[in-house]
Amino acid sequence: MWFKNLQLYRLPTPWNIDLAKFDEQLSRGPFVKCPSNQPMSRGWVSPRRDGALVYSLGQQWMIALSVEQRLLPSSVVNEEVKERAELMEAQQGYAPGRKQLKELRERVTEELMPRAFTRRRTTYVWLDPKNGWFCVDAGSPAKAEEVIEHLRHCLDDFPLTMLHTQVSPQAAMADWLAGGDAPAGFTIDRDCELKAAGEEKAAVRYVRHPLGDEISGEIKAHLASGKMPTKLALTWDDRISFVLGEKMEIKRLAFLDLLKEEAEKSAEHADEQFDADFALMTGELSRFLPQLVEALGGEVVEAK
């Protein structure tokens, strides 16, 4: 259950909603299996599979959104439509028009949908109501938006905003690379991507390559030519490694093995392990995120 990605958002501090009310409002949109005639279904599931839609430990919460989709390849639909269109042409003496083809495609899709396989995925979210963190374990903003959209559908009020810092991640990464050093508490690792802003989007990638003195001049030359960093691998406090993206996304989030071993030692059963993992993960992230924001010049607080 250790998160591997973070899409970062902010809630008011504190967010004044109690656990019982939050759980009650989530129950407006529980997950149900995808009906045979529908392409998709989504809803809340128990993160711990104990029936509760909100898992709570201390003042930290976790929720989970499941999405089930029916897999109906367009190539299968197209082939069936083509065969039926040819049969229609033979029967009526002329090729079906645009309207007929549209209706035919809709009918074929409706007929084939119940026979399509389904695929299910679950996205987890960590909420810290006291400190205003809303973090989605998703590799793309689109998957985070699925969660946010369903929350807006269920909650009476959901005052979520993007996280904005005084210095953009891209500008900060460029500054760190140009200076050859990361801010206090962080170290630069061995992965980096720089891209040009022009139409060709020329890119340079360093993968598992030390970014120290040996190539710092090379990187500075790329920066001077107009390329800007879009990804940079970093480690915080020798405890968390991650890749920071230009749009504030965090990927390849990895916690020091020692932390996981510590959680394993403190748990004897699966439930205890879940609690220990969540407590350690949220404890580390609660320290890490404010320091990352500080490294980016501090948070831009919107005027109320």
UniProtKB/Swiss-Prot annotation:
It is found in: Cytoplasm, Nucleoid. One of its GO terms (cellular component) is bacterial nucleoid. GO terms for molecular function: double-stranded DNA binding. The keyword Metal-binding does not apply. It holds the Pfam family RdgC. NCBIfam families: PRK00321.1-4 (NF001463), PRK00321.1-5 (NF001464). Transmembrane segments: none annotated. One of its GO terms (biological process) is DNA recombination. Keywords: Cytoplasm, DNA recombination. Belongs to the RdgC family. May be involved in recombination. This is Recombination-associated protein RdgC. PANTHER family: RECOMBINATION-ASSOCIATED PROTEIN RDGC (PTHR38103:SF1).
